[in-house]
């Protein structure tokens, strides 16, 4: 009955790896004593995957790798011919000829913020070998909204050099807890430990005091304080926000330093991280017999929004995520959450019971571990402030795109920020979280040099800077030294609005623009000594090759791809994937905004660059090149670009218009099961990519020959979803192995196999035959071609189905022997969200939906237009289950609604059933 143990045994045997392996120990690192197998499914679950052909060393690593189990949970990808039932199929259902809309099971308000574009919730399955659990399975939604909390703080000011040997102290007192005092001592010679060095340089005194505070963080979550230096001042913050923590200060530093008045913390009313259980609820008969889910917790965790995806611990009791505090920068949280009515506001307790009344807990949050009664622990580690800027104690950068990746084998979390730094935290979930040190943090993407502009002009709303440009939309740039020129209408107020840190809205190789409120339009300011200083490149989410090299792959917003060792050293020369000559054409729409996907078995990976001048496979009418799908190969010390495939015909203009990010591709089920190593295209899987812009959205499926991506799309098809400008969500694939058929007959020509059965399969379903044997009418070589391989249904009726295959000799008479023969299979789906054409969640069958003439819309058997506002975040899928509402997808809306999750305008957490798809 235990599916994964069976999967392990068959896989090891199939590859000659069984000797010396105890298959009962497969997954021994996290299988519970009772045999139950938990599987966390977060953003990283689909970033590292394993296909047929893995090595013994990779098999050993997979024993303790939850992402392998998540893959098998969703695919069951044993090798062809193994005889393994790839997933536990369901009883037969009536023959499927049509599919209706996807139905909403439930939608719950997230308040003033939703899941950020391109990010996704995280789902925890308590035991994938059992019926889905109403109480133990849960989903976590990050909320991209500020909480309204404030951190208690106090400002200290230096006016000179304090006396050596004097002290200053900060005391933190949690409500109901024990006060903890941090005492620092001034020194003219020592700048380590609790000592901070002082001199006549006043600003350095501030930096040294702040740095001393930051290197002496408390070991308990509620007692942590940090400090930010700015000029001659030091601002100390209690990391735990709200009224539950108070700050007091003391100082004997004398007249050259003083503390100001303490500003108390404040409690907000907006959650930035929430979780639900009783997921399998909804109208009609549901597994949980409820109408709505229940909140496990609703937390206002810190001050700032959570703009990226969370990661889950193996135990399912902890969550890691990044908060962006406007004063401190990015902060990694490791949250051990509580449960019960103390973990959400009292005003929502009465409607958090799964009934018909929608719960409103997202706007009634508590501060984890601080609000009275909360049993949570919220451990916070400021990233840039404490780790990258340890010496200067200036505020760290935010984190816009980099989600934390948990390497479960070492309990190390990797995460990046907008200044090009990659951080490592270990332990994360098994002890008190701590900075790893060593090479970390490592600035993998270094700050570009300052440039001299040749012209700056402005309307009243847009500033145009003429300068040699390598920036990307969304990256920061600092303009300095611009002065007034009254002859050209450039006034002092104009200059005040132009100088400073700006965010580019459009660019070319020779100029950039940014939006600003300019008092008067100008034809040119004075630029003597003026500089344009790019900010460092934003990092994407890091991905660790947990099944192979153990190396880290991370990209940046200028389309560079890096490979680092687990120790933070450079493993291979970086790839500049957006560069043509000296011009970076990848620097638009965030460069490589999404993390890589790593095929650990085959030693290849994939990224999507927003604009790549090297793409092949079609003519492009765009001026910058295509949005490009790049395949790369890697070893422990090499990184090589293999193939560049265009994702956009040029009509959609993804490469010349801001606001349309591109995301990583997704393999189809055939890729997982068949791999990509065959020299014959038909024996390999496919990978699907998408691009969007002002002219619509395009999907493309690409094939493989001998592990190399073929840059011409499958059958030269380029389906166009629509022609309206629309953001597009990341692609989500899910194979539903829903059918188990008893085969009553098999006949074949040399090209077509006909299977007789009480058929419930549909055209384009994927199927595997087993148990077919030879006889006088059917040769052994015929049987070898019929059994085991993953096939695609070409025609289907209530009594039979066919698939194409190369059969050595046509069968005769009654065909092959089918005693005990079965066919298992089902549909392979692709989910994608749009905000135009119309706004909907679309479902496509793979590969058939994409095999249409160029420019035509793909075949979309299922959609949902009622429960999408402004498009969707990325999606997470859960089970392949027959239980009511237990086979679903989860996402957030990108805009507010007054109909989807209540009548009060709000962003929504949505669960759609897959029942209509099956």
Residue ranges of predicted features:
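Bacterial N-terminal signal peptides that target proteins for export
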Residues: 1-11
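Generic detector of N-terminal low-structure segments
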Residues: 5-6, 17, 23, 516, ...
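Intrinsically disordered, low-structural-confidence terminal and linker regions
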Residues: 9-13, 17, 21-94, 243
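Boundary/junction segments of secreted and surface-exposed precursor proteins
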Residues: 24-48, 106-115, 124, 150-157, ...
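Mobile, glycine-rich extracellular loop/lid and propeptide segments
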Residues: 28, 87-149, 234-236, 258, ...
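Extended, beta-strand-rich, solvent-exposed assembly scaffolds of outer structural proteins
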Residues: 150-267, 298, 448-528, 739-815
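Cys-His-centered catalytic/binding microenvironment captured across papain-like cysteine peptidases
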Residues: 529-532, 817-822
């Amino acid at each position: 009955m235990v599916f994964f143990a069976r999967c392990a045994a068959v896989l090891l045997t199939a590859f000659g790896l069984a000797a010396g392996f105890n298959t009962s120990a497969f997954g021994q690192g996290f299988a519970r004593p009772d045999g139950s197998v938990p599987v966390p499914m977060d953003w990283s679950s689909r970033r590292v995957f394993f296909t047929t052909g893995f090595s013994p060393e990779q098999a050993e690593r997979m024993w303790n790798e939850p992402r392998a189990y998540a893959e098998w949970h969703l695919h069951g990808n044993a090798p062809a011919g193994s005889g393994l039932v790839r997933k536990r199929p369901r009883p037969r259902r009536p023959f499927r000829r049509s599919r209706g809309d996807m139905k909403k099971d439930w939608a719950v308000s997230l308040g003033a913020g939703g899941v950020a574009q391109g990010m996704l919730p995280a789902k925890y399955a308590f035991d994938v070998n059992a019926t889905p659990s109403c109480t133990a399975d849960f989903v976590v939604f990050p909320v991209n909204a500020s909480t309204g909390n404030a951190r208690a703080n106090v400002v200290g000011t230096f006016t000179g050099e304090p006396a050596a040997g004097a002290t200053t102290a900060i005391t933190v007192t949690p409500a109901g807890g024990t006060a903890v005092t941090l005492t620092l001592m001034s020194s003219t010679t020592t700048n380590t430990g609790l000592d901070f060095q002082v001199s006549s340089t006043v600003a350095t005194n501030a930096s040294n005091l702040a740095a001393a505070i930051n290197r002496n963080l408390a070991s308990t979550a509620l007692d942590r304080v940090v400090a930010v230096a700015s000029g001659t001042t030091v601002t100390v913050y209690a990391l735990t926000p709200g009224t539950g923590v108070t700050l007091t200060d003391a100082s004997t530093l004398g007249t050259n330093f003083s503390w100001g008045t303490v500003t108390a913390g404040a409690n907000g009313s907006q959650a930035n991280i929430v979780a639900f259980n009783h997921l399998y609820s909804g109208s009609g008969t549901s597994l949980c017999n409820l109408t709505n889910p229940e909140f496990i917790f609703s937390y206002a965790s810190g001050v700032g929004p959570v703009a990226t995806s969370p990661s889950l611990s193996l135990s399912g009791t902890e969550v890691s995520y990044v908060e962006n505090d406007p004063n401190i920068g990015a902060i990694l949280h490791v949250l051990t959450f509580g449960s019960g009515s103390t973990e959400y506001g009292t005003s929502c307790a009465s409607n958090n019971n799964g009934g018909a009344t929608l719960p409103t807990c997202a706007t009634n949050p508590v501060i984890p571990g601080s609000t009275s009664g909360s049993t949570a622990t919220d451990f916070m580690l400021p990233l840039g402030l404490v780790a990258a800027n340890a010496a200067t104690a200036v505020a760290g950068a935010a984190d816009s795109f980099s989600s934390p990746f948990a390497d479960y084998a070492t309990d190390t979390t990797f995460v990046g920020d907008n200044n090009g730094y990659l951080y490592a935290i270990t332990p994360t979930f098994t002890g008190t979280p701590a900075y790893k040190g060593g090479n970390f943090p490592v600035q993998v993407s270094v700050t570009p040099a300052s440039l001299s502009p040749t012209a700056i002009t402005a309307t009243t709303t847009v500033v145009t800077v003429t300068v040699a440009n390598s920036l990307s939309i969304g990256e920061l740039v600092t303009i300095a030294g611009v002065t007034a020129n009254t002859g050209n209408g450039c006034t002092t107020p104009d200059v005040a609005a132009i100088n400073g840190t700006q965010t580019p809205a459009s660019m070319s190789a020779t100029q950039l623009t940014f939006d600003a409120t300019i008092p008067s339009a100008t034809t040119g300011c004075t630029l003597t000594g003026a500089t344009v200083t790019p900010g460092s490149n934003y990092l994407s989410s890091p991905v660790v090759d947990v099944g192979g090299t153990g190396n880290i792959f991370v990209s940046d917003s200028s389309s560079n791809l890096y490979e680092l060792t687990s120790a933070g050293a450079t493993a291979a020369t970086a790839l500049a994937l957006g560069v043509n000559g000296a011009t970076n054409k990848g620097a638009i729409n965030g460069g490589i905004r999404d993390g890589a996907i790593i095929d650990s078995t085959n030693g290849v990976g994939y990224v999507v660059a927003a604009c790549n001048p090297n793409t092949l496979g079609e003519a492009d009418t765009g001026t910058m090149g295509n949005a490009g799908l790049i395949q790369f190969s890697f070893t422990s010390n090499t990184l090589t670009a293999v193939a560049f495939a265009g994702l956009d015909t040029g009509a959609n203009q993804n490469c010349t218009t801001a606001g349309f990010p591109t995301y990583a591709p997704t393999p189809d089920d055939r890729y997982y099961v068949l791999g990509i190593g065959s020299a014959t295209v038909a024996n390999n899987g496919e990978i699907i990519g998408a691009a969007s812009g002002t002219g619509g959205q395009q999907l493309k499926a690409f094939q493989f020959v001998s592990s190399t991506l073929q840059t011409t799309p499958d059958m030269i098809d380029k389906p166009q979803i629509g022609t309206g400008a629309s953001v597009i969500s990341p692609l989500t694939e899910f194979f539903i192995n829903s059918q188990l058929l008893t085969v009553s007959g098999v006949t074949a020509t040399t090209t077509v196999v006909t299977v007789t059965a009480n058929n419930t399969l549909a055209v384009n379903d994927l199927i595997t035959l087993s148990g077919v044997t030879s006889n006088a009418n059917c040769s052994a070589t015929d049987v070898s071609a019929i059994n085991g391989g993953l096939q695609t249904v070409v025609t289907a009726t209530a009594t039979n189905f066919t698939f194409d295959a190369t059969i050595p000799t046509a069968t005769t008479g009654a065909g092959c022997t089918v005693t005990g023969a079965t066919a298992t299979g089902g549909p392979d789906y692709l989910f994608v969200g749009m905000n135009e054409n119309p706004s909907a969640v679309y479902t496509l069958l793979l590969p058939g939906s994409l095999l249409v003439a160029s420019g035509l819309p793909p075949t979309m058997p299922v959609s949902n237009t009622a429960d999408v506002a402004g498009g969707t975040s990325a999606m997470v899928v859960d089970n392949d289950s027959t239980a009511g509402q237990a086979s679903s997808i989860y996402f957030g809306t990108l805009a507010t609604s007054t109909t989807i999750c209540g009548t009060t305008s709000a962003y929504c957490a949505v669960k759609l059933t897959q029942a209509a798809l099956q």
